[in-house]
A protein has these predicted regions:
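Alpha-helical recognition/docking segments in bacterial nutrient-uptake
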Residues: 1-6, 67-184, 245-247, 251
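Conserved residues at the C-terminal ends of beta-strands
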Residues: 26, 132, 154-155, 197, ...
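Hydrophobic alpha-helical
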Residues: 129, 134-138, 205-265
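Short beta-strand segments enriched in small/hydrophobic residues
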Residues: 22-27, 64-79, 179, 191-200
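Alpha-helical structural signal in soluble globular domains
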Residues: 49, 90-94, 143, 207-219
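N-terminal helix-turn-helix DNA-binding module of bacterial transcription factors
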Residues: 1-67
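Hydrophobic alpha-helical segments within soluble ligand-binding/sensing domains
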Residues: 162-195, 206, 235-243, 264
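Glycine- and acidic-residue-enriched helix-capping/strand-helix junction motifs
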Residues: 84, 200-208
Length: 265
């Protein structure tokens, strides 16, 4: 006679068996699947699997927020950056000091990966999720909200959840002014000698670029159209942008505003 105790299913198990995301499984099990417009056939499949595999709500994904796992998540865009790695270290220290366990992951600035990562974290019943620099923070919110997961955006804001961000405009204004004043009166900087490299069409970059333009006009009296090279955050693409600039102008910029430390690295 087999004395082994059969392991009961978790939300993650049901996700694998049904081919549905953990958040979809959670919605079916907590009865909110109709609000999320999940097909009835999908709900029936998941409920059937839950019964067959002895799913019980007091196990892993009481991600329906009735129990606490002690896990706190931090989703970063990348790991290999001083800003984000420093944030991760500080985060881990604060979480551990509260007797909880930090879970740090990256989603590689990929909106689909951000949502998949959030779904996976939900399947492990994390208690909170800090979303840092997400490409699509509202997409992540749409995964977290139905599961009842507390979450907040850091660095880049979303429209559907609370956000904590830096004053990118004022920071860029101060930096642009400092660059200009560094040259003094003996060999003052001309408008066509100061360039901004890096960044893309996100909130932080838009604020920095707006301040860069405004400060150049205010202090230098002009702002040529080609003063901003939005080369994204990739160091390789930024390097190619520098090479293209050099080929076109025969020299490097006299003064340079780097939009992100990722570009500089």
């Amino acid at each position: 006679m087999d004395q082994r105790v059969k392991k009961k299913a978790t939300i993650y198990d049901l996700s694998v068996l049904s081919g549905s995301s953990p958040s979809t499984v959670s919605a079916v099990l907590n009865g909110t699947w109709r609000k999320r417009r999940i097909k009835e056939s999908t709900a029936e499949t998941i409920l059937g699997l839950a019964e067959r595999h002895q799913y019980t709500t007091n196990l892993q994904a009481r991600g329906l927020r009735r129990s606490r796992s002690g896990l706190v998540g931090l989703m970063l865009p990348v790991h290999d950056n001083r800003y984000f790695s420093s944030m991760a270290q500080t985060f881990e220290g604060h979480v551990r000091s509260r007797g909880q366990c930090p879970v740090v992951v990256s989603a590689s600035r990929d909106p689909e990966e951000e949502r998949r990562t959030a779904e996976t974290l939900i399947s492990y019943s994390i208690d909170q999720l800090f979303i840092v620099g997400a490409t699509d923070p509202d997409g992540v919110h749409e995964v977290c909200e139905p599961a009842g997961l507390k979450h907040i955006n850091i660095d880049l804001p979303g429209a559907k959840a609370h956000s904590v961000i830096s004053d990118n405009y004022e920071g860029a204004r101060m930096l642009t002014e400092a660059i200009i004043r560094h040259f003094g009166n003996d060999a003052p900087l001309r408008p066509d000698e100061l360039f901004l490299f890096g960044g893309r069409n996100d909130h932080a970059s838009r604020e920095r670029i707006a301040a860069f333009h405004a400060t150049k006009k205010a202090l230098l009296g002009a702002d040529p159209e080609d003063g901003v090279q939005s080369s994204g955050y990739s160091p390789d693409i930024t390097l190619r942008a520098f090479e293209t600039f050099y080929q076109r102008h025969g020299k490097l910029p006299r003064a340079l505003f780097i939009n992100s430390s990722i570009n500089m690295e």
